[in-house]
Amino acid sequence: KLYGVPFGTAMAGGILYNRKIYQDLGLSVPKTWADFMANNAKVKASGKVAVAQTYRDTWTSQLFVLADYYNLHAAVPNFAADYTANKAKYAETPAAMKGFERLKDVHDAGLMNEDFGAASYDDGLRMVSTGEAAHYPMLSFAVSALKQNYPENLADVGFFAQPSDDAATNGLTVWMPPGLYIPATSQHAEEAKKFVDFAGSAPGASTESSAD
């Protein structure tokens, strides 16, 4: 049976970076956390902000943890199922604590903007797109806001996966899109089916993506 139709786009968690800064400083996209921190040290030495953080919008503070899930799953494949079943805990799983430790690493190395507690999500996008900052841990949906608010700088922004300690383990944390569903008790099932059919079609997907 068909229970639902995907609606929207998949989303990834990783790190936005300024391509111009990377080019000017001769940096390469890091494949390990050590490489990332070495890049940050060079950025800081150049006088730029290495990692933008924007805790005025508190949800942005979790990105180092969220984006590290690919690495957590690679190290402990059963963690999500065990965590859901209350058989595993973050504090007792070293691989799960890595994301929190990454945030501490960046803070303790003095790599953040001084106003990280007051800066907003849009401040972070501005900083990484205009070259005030080299990196901004973020979700890929930020492309829409960058396109809207900083279109002239959009091409200067790249995106890479949050590195692990092993270059052989390197990938994006991905969220699949939500779905549209029709209740069996709906009094307008036929109308709803027509809408869902359109939403799941190529024209419907194109319309939704272009408006996002």
Task: Give the positions of each predicted feature.
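Extracytoplasmic/periplasmic substrate-recognition and gating elements
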Residues: 24, 109, 148-211
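Periplasmic solute-binding protein
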Residues: 1-31, 37, 57-84, 174-182
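A local structural motif
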Residues: 24-29, 104-118, 132, 149-157
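Glycine-centered hinge/linker elements that transmit conformational signals in sensory
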Residues: 40-42, 84-116
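Beta->alpha turn/N-cap motifs
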Residues: 121, 138-143, 176-178
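Alpha-to-beta junction loops
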Residues: 46-50, 129-138, 155
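Short helix-initiation/N-cap motifs at beta->coil->alpha
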Residues: 31-38, 115-129
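Short, solvent-exposed loop/beta-turn-alpha elements that line the ligand-binding surface or hinge
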Residues: 72-98, 148-152, 161-171
